Amino acid sequence: QERLSEPGRTVMAEVIQILTQQGATIVDPADIPSVTDSDAENNLLANGNESSVLSYGMKRDFNAWLETLGESVPVKTLTELREWNLAHELAGTLKYGQARLDGADELDLEEDRGKYEVDRERDLRLNGEHGIDEVMMNLKLDALLFPGSSGAGISARPGYPTVIVPFAFVATDPDPPMPAGFDLKPRPFGVSFTGMACSEPRLLQL
């Protein structure tokens, strides 16, 4: 909870209290082994936790999908899509930018395949086997509880399920602050229940 805001900590304390009242057994701490491992090879946060898997897969699979659409499609590759967006910027194609597309398109699907495979193995091992699997099996847990969507990254990389339950609204304290007169509304705050592979039925049951 060190990175949570004070309102976030208050909400999480309330969540834990309600779960306890409903009969849940809260195990705290339940540290992710790959986060606390002193060996850099086995530490999820080493090297900034960077992985090429999402970007590589995006380019590979997007190009493969475009090939299935036939000749009527106006763009045939991710590169062509990026170029089309740039050419039509005045029409609003880049309202939110395309940094994710740019990063993916920088990869070469042949030359970078080796790095992708290494990163994929590391993602599965540190997020899954030495991460979620290990802590849940060692402590005999039904689920891991995360504030908001903070557990989405560690569960997404090995393809594990997460159920996010809306719970409250909390005050927003942006840094830097918003301009004077800006009416900043409270933001929604949910809690995430994450499990091991194929544990969706148990998560929904909880």
Pin down the residues of each PLM region.
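Glycine-rich, small-residue loops and helix-cap segments
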Residues: 13, 18, 95, 99-206
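Acidic/polar loop patches that form or flank catalytic/metal-binding clefts of enzymes
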Residues: 22-31, 73-79, 143-146, 163
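Short, solvent-exposed polar/charged micro-motifs at secondary-structure junctions
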Residues: 36-45, 90-92, 173-176
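N-terminal leader/propeptide and maturation segments of large enzyme subunits in energy/redox metabolism
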Residues: 52, 58, 64-125
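Gly/Ser-rich, acidic/histidine-flanked active-site/gating loops
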Residues: 1-72
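Residue-level preference for alpha-helix termini and adjacent loops
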Residues: 3, 52-53, 57, 64, ...
